[in-house]
């Protein structure tokens, strides 16, 4: 399962679903307004890979907050990109990593 934090636009999550990915969002999980640490803990407790547009999140993970126990983070920047472009980039990244464990990894889309 992919957990799209509150920085990920809902239409991006919907586009990934249309491509067959299991995605839930911070809106659906009612975690809007949570800190990055709380989003990370929420995903870790459920074993969900996190999708984020928030580069502060990278500092949190790279800084050792969750050591190597986090279920994986997929990061991409939304700046200057359309929803369609983002969906394609993220889908392509997910396809390349299909079946591979992302625990402790940060993947850039």
Regions found by a protein language model. Give the residues of each.
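Conserved BB-loop
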Residues: 22-34
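Short beta-strand scaffold positions
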Residues: 3-4, 52
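Acidic, PIN/NYN-like endoribonuclease modules and their adjacent C-terminal/linker elements
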Residues: 5-6, 10, 14-17, 31, ...
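Mobile, glycine- and charge-enriched loop segments
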Residues: 1, 19
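Acidic, metal-binding active-site segment of PIN/NYN-like and related structure-specific nucleases
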Residues: 36, 44, 48-63
């Amino acid at each position: 399962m992919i957990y799209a934090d509150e920085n990920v636009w809902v239409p991006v999550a919907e586009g990934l679903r249309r491509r067959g990915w299991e995605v839930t969002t911070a809106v659906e999980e009612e975690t809007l307004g949570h800190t990055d640490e709380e989003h990370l803990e929420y995903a870790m407790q459920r074993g969900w890979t996190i999708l984020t547009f928030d580069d502060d999140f990278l500092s949190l993970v790279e800084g050792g907050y969750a050591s190597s126990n986090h279920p994986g983070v997929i990061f991409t920047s939304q700046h200057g990109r359309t929803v369609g472009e983002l969906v394609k980039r993220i889908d392509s990244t997910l396809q390349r990593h299909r079946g591979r464990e992302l625990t402790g990894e940060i993947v850039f889309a």
